[in-house]
From Swiss-Prot:
It comes from Francisella tularensis subsp. tularensis (strain SCHU S4 / Schu 4). It comes from the Bacteria. Disulfide bonds: none annotated. InterPro entries: PRibTrfase_dom (IPR000836), PRTase-like (IPR029057), Upp_B (IPR034332), UPRTase/APRTase (IPR050054), Ura_phspho_trans (IPR005765). Signal peptide: none annotated. Allosterically activated by GTP. This is Uracil phosphoribosyltransferase. It holds the Pfam family UPRTase. The gene is upp. Keywords: Allosteric enzyme, Glycosyltransferase, GTP-binding, Magnesium, Nucleotide-binding, Transferase.
Length: 209
């Protein structure tokens, strides 16, 4: 599995601010959007270009570069993933949205989809899953499986922080996806929280506890 940890100084600086215990909802939300925007820029750097002809401002036909082939659907994992969508839209404002919601079954401890609203022609699109954190990997693995079952063949993932345990689990389950993250953190604690992590990203984005 392709794993890219973005080392850009602006990404690291902004992520560092997000780790503060005193951060406000407004600031956390803003930084989530800004980092997601920077990560989206990195994800799309590998997209192919093709020449196309348009009528230029001077009244003559000219050749311009345009992204080739596949369109994009952004896939936020509810609810925290919603806070990352605007960062993607800054670069791909026409992206379709496919939403997935997961909950943990208390008996099996496995993630179960409680909501899925996917756009059409997934097999013709790049699916960009967004979720602030990759911890154990359970929800992410289940989301990728759901998308593949619906026809998706090209899946990329953006997270703000990722745990090595989650990366390993995802790589074993879906070695064909690509992961772009602002940080590979140290480990999961005994409660399965990422250390040093960000705390509960969903609560911090939406101002809940």
């Amino acid at each position: 599995m392709k794993v890219v940890e973005i080392s850009h100084p602006m990404v690291k600086h902004k992520l560092g601010l997000m780790r503060a215990a005193s951060i406000s909802t407004q600031e956390f939300r803003r930084l989530t959007k800004e980092i997601t925007s920077l990560l989206t820029y990195e994800v799309t750097a590998g997209f192919e270009l093709e020449k196309t002809e348009i009528l230029g401002w001077q009244g003559e036909n000219i050749e311009i570069d345009q992204i080739k082939g596949k369109k994009l659907t952004v896939v936020p994992i509810l609810r925290a993933g919603l806070g990352m969508m605007d960062g993607v839209f800054e670069h791909v404002p026409a992206a379709k949205v496919s939403m997935v919601g997961m909950y943990r079954d208390e008996k099996t401890a496995k993630p179960v989809a409680y909501f899925a609203k996917l756009c059409d022609k997934l097999d013709e699109r790049v699916a960009l899953i967004v979720d602030p954190m990759l911890a154990t990997g359970g929800s992410m693995i289940a989301t990728v499986s759901l998308l593949k079952k619906a026809g998706s063949k090209d899946i990329k993932i953006i997270t703000l922080v990722s745990a090595p345990e989650g990366i390993d689990a995802l790589a074993k389950a879906h070695p064909d996806v690509e992961l772009y993250t602002a940080s590979i953190d140290s480990h999961l604690n005994d409660k399965k929280y990422i250390i040093p992590g960000l705390g509960d990203a969903g609560d911090k984005i939406f101002g809940t506890k």
